[in-house]
Amino acid sequence: MKHAENEYLNLCRHVMEHGTKKEDRTGTGTVSVFGYQMRFDLSKGFPLLTTKRVPFRLVASELLWFMKGDTNIRYLLQHNNNIWNEWAFKSWVESDEYTGPDMTDFGLRSQQDEEFKVQYDEQMELFKKNVLEDDEFSNKYGYLGDVYGKQWRAWKTTAGETLDQLKDVIEMIKKTPDSRRLIVSAWNPEDVPSMALPPCHTLFQFYVADGKLSCQLYQRSGDIFLGIPFNIASYSLLTHLIAHECGLEVGEFVHTIGDAHIYTNHFEQVEKQLAREPRPFPKLTLNPDVKSVFDFEMEDLTIEGYDPHPAIKAPVAV
């Protein structure tokens, strides 16, 4: 029987073989295709990739951060999650208050220059310490703009009010499960210019049939090697959490990607991953005593039977 992970591995193969070479804002370069869809049956295991280790702890803490409506990296740092650091760090080193060594193009330079990487690591550690310990600094430089959490939980209206899209969609699933309006959008054109990183996963929609909750994500831009594995796990987890509160079983996670790309400096890593055989997906267990999605904490989420191949490191394009 075909392993569900092949949905992802086939995406990698397709882009490597048929992708178009493109330039990008990071200066790294990509190969990409436009318009690709994957489907995962969530009743047959939790789609945490096994051909390389994907850290569930980071996936879960980021999702809980989104769901809290938080847009400051302090919560993530408190949970030893560093995946958003570079975007906050960028605003700090480009500010008038920063007086340390030149950090221009730190993403690329830290990969190419060992001496610079030492300086970069020192400045990043100092930055993280300040975000964790200095409230004023954290409020100013730990803040990422009105990114996912703000749009999900406090979308600004023209009337000066806010909409809690996530809370509203959960209530709609309970009351009108056949609605075709079970949608949450993170793409707010007015706020995009002030965001540290405009939303890559832009809109998601729920669908209820036969007592099962399915979710489809539209992602405008997907970093196939580093980002997409996180996105698959994150929205699968979100579907489980909402199904749990609504008294539903899980159905499918459908992942639709606009610009699906592999960075040129990830080719070697992708080839290494494609040479590996998938292993059985793990099982996700939720604390049955927690009833609301907004009350879940890290200790309420458990992954069992996860036996992946080793992690494969790759640089992040900032």
UniProtKB/Swiss-Prot annotation:
The family this protein is said to belong to: Belongs to the thymidylate synthase family. Bacterial-type ThyA subfamily.
UniProt subcellular location: Cytoplasm
Keyword Cytoplasm: yes
Binding site for (6R)-5,10-methylene-5,6,7,8-tetrahydrofolate: 223, 317
Coiled coil stretches, renumbered: none
Binding-site list for dUMP: 25, 180-181, 220-223, 231, 261-263
Name by which UniProt lists this protein: Thymidylate synthase
Any GO CC annotation of this UniProt entry: cytosol
Purpose: Catalyzes the reductive methylation of 2'-deoxyuridine-5'-monophosphate (dUMP) to 2'-deoxythymidine-5'-monophosphate (dTMP) while utilizing 5,10-methylenetetrahydrofolate (mTHF) as the methyl donor and reductant in the reaction, yielding dihydrofolate (DHF) as a by-product. This enzymatic reaction provides an intracellular de novo source of dTMP, an essential precursor for DNA biosynthesis.
Biological pathway: Pyrimidine metabolism; dTTP biosynthesis
Quaternary context: Homodimer.
Catalytic reaction annotation: dUMP + (6R)-5,10-methylene-5,6,7,8-tetrahydrofolate = 7,8-dihydrofolate + dTMP
Enzyme class: transferase
Gene Ontology molecular function, alphabetical: thymidylate synthase activity
Keywords: Cytoplasm, Methyltransferase, Nucleotide biosynthesis, Transferase
UniProt keyword Metal-binding, yes or no: no
Pfam families xrefs: Thymidylat_synt
Main location: cytoplasm
Record NCBIfam families: PRK01827.1-2, thym_sym
